[in-house]
């Protein structure tokens, strides 16, 4: 059985730090994408199936971007598991149901690797939705 904490118990400091690191990395990634000409359509889009860190558009392309923050870019590159990819794909399908006007756009699943004191590394088409 999964552990649950009471609503009055504050989260552990390491969880708070990880959350703040994630928010900071997503902000850096979004700024980097905007500098490359993307428009940010959504951040932290939550569904029952999973969450998409960033949904970005450039022309007729929609990019579903997973942001991975680690101490080193090499470590971040290996942090996107097949299970996470499936959850992101399912969440992207939910986003498209909620945003049908984008259904005819080209769709792509990207990764953005973020490490301290380094520019984010954008990996277009990091994975695809084919089985």
Curated annotation (Swiss-Prot):
InterPro entries with a match to the protein in the record: Restrct_endonuc-II-like, tRNA_endonuc-like_dom_sf, UPF0102_YraN-like
Top-level division of the source organism's lineage: Bacteria
A Pfam family: UPF0102
GO function terms (MF aspect): nucleic acid binding
Family statement: Belongs to the UPF0102 family.
NCBIfam families for this protein: PRK12497.1-5 (NF009151), YraN family protein (TIGR00252)
Name of the featured protein: UPF0102 protein RPD_0400
Species name: Rhodopseudomonas palustris (strain BisB5)
């Amino acid at each position: 059985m999964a552990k649950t904490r009471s609503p009055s118990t504050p989260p552990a400091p390491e969880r708070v730090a990880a959350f703040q690191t994630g928010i900071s990395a997503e902000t850096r990634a979004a700024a980097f994408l905007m500098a490359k000409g993307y428009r940010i359509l959504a951040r932290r889009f939550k569904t029952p199936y999973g969450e998409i860190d960033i949904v970005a558009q450039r022309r007729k392309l929609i990019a579903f971007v997973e942001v991975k923050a680690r101490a080193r870019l090499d470590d971040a590159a290996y942090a996107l598991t097949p299970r996470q990819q499936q959850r992101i794909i399912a969440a992207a399908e939910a986003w498209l149901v909620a945003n049908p006007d984008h259904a005819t756009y080209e769709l792509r699943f990207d990764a953005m690797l973020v490490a301290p004191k380094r520019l984010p590394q954008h990996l277009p088409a990091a994975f695809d939705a084919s089985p």
